Structure formats: structure tokens, C-alpha cells
């Protein structure tokens, strides 16, 4: 469930200088007596292994109504893959952007997910052509943005120390989708399907 977070944090005062002696204080930065209010946009931050991020991702992916854009570094979780197939079966276009080396290694070890997607209409996959990492772990369906450190692997979603941030902030969603479209349009991408 999403919530509205408002955080009031005191900024460090003069004591900061002992750790950063050459750091000058910008004029726009509040003094230690001021408070700073964080964004009040709806967001939720979740952590594994305390929470099962796989269930959170699946529940929110299933709510996709218009499209689903995914940039995922590692992707070996079959339950998440099935949720994506279910979304595509409803006629919703799904675009998946992957890191080249990670995708190739996963195909060599276990091509199950790629084979599942290959049999499914409405799923398009592109792999970054460059050897520079595509290290994002994010998705958007136009109404929700998920970002964080958690890859889509069973261990990454359930056992490792990872985070997933979910937000409905329209500006954040637009920013991700703009960046995703730029990545998707690269001329050196490999079109998988």
C-alpha cells in the first residue's frame, strides 16, 4: 500500500566542517536551525529479506492497464515472468530492455524465461548493444514506477539485502519513461523479439 511520506530532517551544522574542511556551505542550503521537508509524493520503500519483493512486484505489475516498460539487469525469476505474460495476454504491450552480457549468460544457463516470452504476443525485448552495463532494476506502467537495487532473481527479491521503491509521482514516471524510450531507441540495440 502506498503512503504519503513527509520527513523533517535537521541538517548538520558547524560540526560538518570537521569532516569536510574544504567544503563551503552553499547560500541556498538551510542552516542547522532550519528544517527541510521531503517530498510529499506517494511512495513506498520496501526491503528484502524482511519483505518478499517478488510478491510486491507481481501484485503491482498485475495492475498494469496501458503498457509495461521494464529495464532489468538480472531476470531469472519465473513467477515475475509469468505475471508479465499474464499482463501481455490481456493485450497490454510489454517492452523489456536488458543488459547484453547478463542476458547472454542467462540464456546459456537457463533459457526458460526467453522461451516463455517468445511464445507470447505483446512482448518486445531489446538488449543493449554496447558492453557498457545497463544496470537498472526498474519498471513503469504509466501509473507506477518501481526502482531500486533488487534484480528479478529469487535470491534478489527474497533473500538478499535489497530495496524496491514504488512511487506514483507523475514527474518521476515521465522521467523514467523518457529515459527508457531513449535506451529503447538506441541504434546498436539487439532486437530479440
What are these regions (language model features)?
Residues 43-49, 70-73, 123-125:
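Short, flexible loop segments at the rims of nucleotide/cofactor-binding pockets, characterized by
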Residues 69-72, 95-98, 126-127, 140, ...:
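Structural recognition of the beta-strand scaffold that forms the well-ordered cores
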Residues 74-78, 100-104, 131-133, 145, ...:
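Solvent-exposed loop/turn segments at secondary-structure junctions
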Amino acid at each position: 500500500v502506498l503512503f504519503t511520506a513527509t520527513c523533517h530532517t535537521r541538517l548538520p551544522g558547524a560540526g560538518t566542517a570537521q569532516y569536510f574542511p574544504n567544503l563551503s556551505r552553499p547560500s541556498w542550503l538551510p542552516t542547522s536551525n532550519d528544517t527541510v521537508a521531503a517530498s510529499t509524493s506517494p511512495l513506498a520503500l520496501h526491503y528484502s529479506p524482511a519483505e518478499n519483493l517478488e510478491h510486491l512486484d507481481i501484485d503491482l505489475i498485475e495492475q498494469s492497464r496501458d503498457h509495461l516498460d521494464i529495464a532489468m539487469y538480472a531476470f531469472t525469476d519465473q513467477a515475475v515472468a509469468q505475471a508479465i505474460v499474464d499482463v501481455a495476454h490481456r493485450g497490454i504491450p510489454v517492452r523489456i530492455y536488458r543488459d547484453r552480457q547478463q542476458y547472454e549468460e542467462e540464456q546459456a544457463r537457463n533459457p526458460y524465461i526467453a522461451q516463455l516470452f517468445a511464445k507470447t504476443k505483446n512482448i518486445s525485448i531489446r538488449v543493449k548493444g554496447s558492453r557498457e552495463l545497463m544496470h537498472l532494476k526498474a519498471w513503469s506502467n504509466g501509473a507506477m514506477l518501481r526502482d531500486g537495487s533488487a534484480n528479478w532473481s529469487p535470491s534478489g527479491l527474497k533473500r538478499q539485502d535489497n530495496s524496491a521503491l514504488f512511487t506514483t509521482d507523475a514527474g518521476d514516471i515521465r522521467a523514467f519513461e523518457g529515459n527508457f524510450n531513449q535506451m529503447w531507441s538506441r541504434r546498436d540495440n539487439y532486437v530479440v523479439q
